[in-house]
Swiss-Prot record:
Its EC number is 1.4.99.-. Oxidative deamination of D-amino acids. FAD binds at residues 3-17. Belongs to the DadA oxidoreductase family. This is D-amino acid dehydrogenase. Keywords: FAD, Flavoprotein, Oxidoreductase. Its cofactor is FAD. The keyword Acyltransferase does not apply. GO terms for molecular function: D-amino-acid dehydrogenase activity. It catalyses: a D-alpha-amino acid + A + H2O = a 2-oxocarboxylate + AH2 + NH4(+). InterPro entries: DadA, FAD-dep_OxRdtase, FAD/NAD-bd_sf. Disulfide bonds: none annotated. GO terms for cellular component: cytoplasm; plasma membrane.
Length: 417
């Protein structure tokens, strides 16, 4: 049995990995020269199982209106009459109801927890080095209102069996000593001990080598020209490297999956939500984060690698615009300077932007399509690194028949109505 996977970001890569483990002869196609050269390249570095939450949440519509007027707001919207964006935004607003939020978060937590198990097993079986740490995530709050608002999430964490700890300011400092100088800015925190961190790009390079050793073929610098169909199935994929034929095909091209599937008459509600990051070399380890610190006010994550800090945040609805405006640089720079002002050499900060493939409900699209041998694994938003291993394993189970056809409503058919 043969499989073709389109896309070698972390999600496509793990789709290929688990398909080869299931016995498939796998070929991966990517337009870049290496795996993870696009959205997986410089993400936040969080593997945030407990923080797997949809952006569509109660109160977000009101917050979004306020954020439009703030200089360092976590959400920015570039005015547009793009019908895809308007439809996506309408669907997202519909998912801000509490009942929908609870369903969506429960789905996301289920995938994330499964992914934790898969990544743990992967580390046990293979010697992979990606500057990973298993030291949890600390979400810090700056207002009493934020402390109260987090209770609804804590209830869902309890339902899913996710471990957590409410923390006073003193406990936050004990967990992250680098915050001591700014303790007066904090009101408390929420600590999730089972969360992890790691450089997604390094992980992908390691996994590419492992996959190649297991017989997976990678066609880099190769563009997908056309997906060819006959009846209700795919018969081949036309690429720069020629025609590829397989028994099953997987679209894992992140935000670019939408346009490819549209050519086949398949509509998916995945929109590119632009995110930004900066990477700072550490100059004083005692002043740097130990693991990941989440700033609830600005929705920015600060993650420790070995000798670097990765700072990532901001959601911008601007289509596929690759520009990095100075205002976005200022926002993420402000947060790291505010919380860890003496941690790194900010003059050497490297900025990056990527397009997160976001669905309106936050839950990825994993599973079947109207074409019987075509599958999707996309739409993970900010959680591609968190969910990649679990999503890849789950997809392989769906394809091989080990798993139900539509576990927890994860495939695109939940949008059929």
């Amino acid at each position: 049995m043969k499989a073709v996977v389109l896309g070698s970001g972390v999600v496509g890569l793990m789709s290929a990995w688990y398909l080869q483990k299931a016995g498939y002869q796998v070929t991966v196609v990517d337009r870049q020269a290496r795996s993870a050269e696009e959205t997986s390249f410089a993400n936040a570095g969080q593997i945030s199982y407990g923080y797997s939450s949809p952006w569509a949440a109660p109160g977000i519509p009101q917050k979004a209106l306020r954020w439009l007027m703030e200089e360092h707001a976590p959400l920015k919207i570039k005015p547009s009459l793009d019908p895809q964006l308007l439809k996506w935004a309408t669907q997202m607003l519909a998912n801000c109801q509490l009942s929908r939020y609870q369903v969506n978060k429960a789905r996301m937590l289920a995938i994330a927890n499964h992914s934790r198990e898969c990544l743990s097993q992967l580390r046990q079986e293979h010697d992979i080095e990606y500057q990973g740490r298993q030291q949890g995530t600390l979400q810090v709050f700056r207002t009493q209102k934020q402390l109260i608002a987090i209770e609804k999430d804590i209830a869902l964490l309890e339902q899913s069996g996710t471990r957590y700890q409410r923390m006073s300011v003193d406990e936050c400092i004990k967990q992250e000593p680098g915050l001591a100088a700014v303790s007066h800015k904090l009101t408390g925190g929420l600590y999730l001990p089972d969360d992890e961190t790691g450089d997604c790009y390094l992980f992908c390079q390691q996994m590419t080598e492992l996959a190649q050793q297991q017989g997976v073929t990678f066609l880099f610098n190769t563009n997908v020209k056309k997906v060819n169909t006959q009846g209700n199935q795919v018969v081949s994929v036309s690429t720069d490297a020629g025609e590829l034929q397989a028994d099953v095909y997987v679209v894992a091209m992140g935000s670019y999956s939408t346009a490819l599937l549209a050519k086949l008459g398949i509509t998916i509600p995945v929109y590119p939500v632009k995110g930004y990051s900066l990477t700072v070399p550490i100059t004083d380890e005692s002043q740097a984060p130990v693991s990941t610190v989440m700033d609830e006010t600005y929705k920015v994550a600060l993650t420790r690698f070995d000798d670097r800090i990765r700072v990532a945040g901001t959601a911008e609805l601007a289509g596929f615009d690759p520009a990095i405006p100075e205002k976005r640089k200022a926002t993420i720079s402000m947060v790291v300077n505010d919380l860890f002002p003496h941690s790194g050499d900010f003059a050497k900060a490297e900025f990056w932007t990527g397009f997160r493939p976001m669905t309106p409900d936050g839950t990825p699209l994993i599973g079947k399509t109207p074409l019987k041998n075509l599958y999707t694994n996309t739409g993970h938003g900010t959680l591609g690194w968190t969910m990649a291993c679990g999503s890849g394993h789950l997809l392989s189970q769906i394809i091989t028949g080990e798993q139900s056809e539509n576990p927890a409503g994860l495939d695109l058919f939940r949008y059929a109505s």
